[in-house]
């Protein structure tokens, strides 16, 4: 069984030999949070699509606002869970357990850092390029494990790479975050050879030893050696729950603002989480609020509060199984019947009316095309760097990416690092320039 005393560590990745905890107002895990907020990759999230196209006159969520909101919910989940565990096991009071809220909050901030531009279509475009597109020509030139990495490219694994990899000119250890924050980000703690049809995995072959080091230090349960697989770090369940709560609620709220859902439909969806007595009380409160968007915001906040309670209880009810590495599914799948039914109904409505709406499909089509084109040109450039046009493209890439590495797989990874780090706006601008549709001002 995994142990809370070892699962939570302030040791920093890349600074293991120099680890010395500072006794200041900020804990080591709060430092993780601040370090992420002040980073360039985090700032770039403001120009990355969440679901809907980046805003015109109506402001909807982007990756940045989504990550901040997930972080807030994650902090509440972590704080509530820590409080309950300490009531059960007061001997843990002098451990790092009271810091769970800060750890989960920091991990939530970082959970989408590895996602490419243009939302889910951008993330799908990368593995599709290798499994169905021109990238298929590379299969015979790469070892099987590296090929699996490419054909199952996953934003979560890419986030772990971004946070731990030593890019050119940067310090060892990447962001140099604490072991526990890093482990809490990895939803799928196994290699790409176990990715399966869902294409989910937690680390590329280049970062496998880094993850192994972290997992062994924290005492995470190893399930398999080759291919490598661990049970999740328990705090991953809280990060996942915060994400599940936020994307469902915020997509509904955004759909209302964009008039994809009517006010009546939205109110009914949000009220369906509650029993009749609570529902009647909430409707009375709505009588005092005349602004329709504020009414929806109030109902949304009530649902989020309820789901935080439900997921907290689900974690506590299953703590032993989670620590044994035997818990299956997400916490949201283990909540009470009424909110579970309402959540599933919201998910169905989101699929039918939101994710298949014209605006969402248009941005997915454009994003897929843009990412595929950039990949095609950049991969060809690193395969044939001697060509004149290849040199023009390669010289366009920031020096932090090892685009001229002697090993082909490392050059391909540099291309993926470069493209996945782009904002929607930057990727679109580069696409237009490459196609001759936009010329720089002279």
Task: Name each model feature, range by range.
Residues 31-43, 335-341:
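Acidic, low-complexity proline/glycine-rich segments
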Residues 316-398:
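Substrate-recognition/cap regions that form aromatic- and gly/pro-loop-enriched pockets
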Residues 1-25, 37-48, 57, 68, ...:
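Sequence-structural signature of the catalytic-core scaffold of metal-dependent phosphohydrolases
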Residues 246, 250, 254, 308-320, ...:
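Hydrophobic alpha-helix feature that most strongly marks membrane-spanning transmembrane helices
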Residues 48-58, 349-354:
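A short small-residue
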Residues 61-65:
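Low-complexity, highly charged intrinsically disordered N-terminal segments
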Residues 384, 391-439:
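C-terminal amphipathic alpha-helical interaction region
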